[in-house]
Amino acid sequence: MDQNNNTVSEFIMLGFTTDPVIQKVLFAVFLVVYTLTLMGNSSLIMLICNDSRLHTPMYFFIGNLSFLDLGLSSVYTPKILETCISEDKSISFAGCVAQFFFSAALDYTECYLLAAMAYDRYVAISKPLLYSQAMSLKLCVCFVVASYVGGFINSVIITKDTFALTFCNDNVIDDFFCDIPPLVKLACGKKKSFQSVLFFLLTSNVIIPIVFILATYLFIIATILRIRSTQGRLKAFSTCSSHLISVTLYYGSILYIYARPRSSYSLDRDKIVSTFYTVVFPMLNPLIYSLRNKDVKEALNKLLK
């Protein structure tokens, strides 16, 4: 990514609004959300590390998901807070590249990790007696490492191609972070090859994991339906309900933004949806995975005593 190939040295973030009063309100809201995100995910990681009852494959993946959410929130939110209270709305070209790269890498990694978690839930429900052997620590680590490797490799590709575009002196980003739709909107010249790369990455990082997760849940549902007792069915379903909620919220928002036809893009509407998967969902995930979780509640009570 050679900056000399572009005619801009910095970008201007429009953010959400130019109204100073609303900006202050948004600053307070995002600060509270970011604080809760840091506290919630850090606490969940600490509980998983310190309580031996949570040293299982499921919580190993949940802990890694919390770590990713900490990273994602920290990539986005500090710059959002700065944009809300500072008159200087600029971000350097290098800063935009860095934010874009790490946000894409962590997002892609989370896509793969959620797919790995779906497989973990399938094994837990379909082979409960062999769960510990089937989901060994070595296999879990391999899944996590593969998720990171895949996420960062794909991020290198999309970052390189995005910032190889020519921006033609237009450097105003109508968004609160460096994202694909507003950057492509700024670019001029040939975009056809870029759209091909974007389609490939959308397929490999989002569509394929979604298809895998859907197939996995079909097998999970088939397994649950074979359970004779109602209590057994409810218990089996409860083990994957949190993951299903997380997958639906996360992938739903990503598909809404990136899988729609370009003619239907609305940056104002997309800002709201983007806020959820970049800022709100990292705060909600610890709640989703712990509110109805007996083991996490017991570990928390033990820690607080």
Curated annotation (Swiss-Prot):
The cellular component terms of Gene Ontology attached to this UniProt record, alphabetical and capped at eight, are: membrane; plasma membrane
Q: Record's Pfam families?
A: 7tm_4
Record PROSITE patterns? G_PROTEIN_RECEP_F1_1, G_PROTEIN_RECEP_F1_2
Q: Does the keyword Cell membrane apply?
A: yes
What InterPro entries does this protein's entry cite? GPCR_Rhodpsn (IPR000276), GPCR_Rhodpsn_7TM (IPR017452), Olfact_rcpt (IPR000725)
The residue spans the entry assigns to the Extracellular side of the membrane are as follows 1-24, 77-96, 160-204, 258-270
**Annotated transmembrane regions:** 25-45, 56-76, 97-117, 139-159, 205-225, 237-257, 271-291
Instruction: Indicate what this protein is called per its UniProt record.
Output: Olfactory receptor 9G19
Q: Where does this one sit in the cell?
A: Cell membrane
**Per the record, what ranges lie on the membrane's Cytoplasmic side?**
46-55, 118-138, 226-236, 292-305
What family is this?
Belongs to the G-protein coupled receptor 1 family.
Which terms are listed as keywords in the entry?
A: Cell membrane, Disulfide bond, G-protein coupled receptor, Membrane, Olfaction, Receptor, Sensory transduction, Transducer, Transmembrane, Transmembrane helix
* Disulphide bonds in the chain: C96-C178
Annotated membrane topology is: Multi-pass membrane protein
> For this chain's UniProt record, which GO biological process terms are given?
G protein-coupled receptor signaling pathway; sensory perception of smell
Q: Name one GO molecular function term.
A: G protein-coupled receptor activity
What is the species listed in this Swiss-Prot or TrEMBL entry?
Mus musculus (Mouse)
The job of this chain, per UniProt, is described as: Odorant receptor.
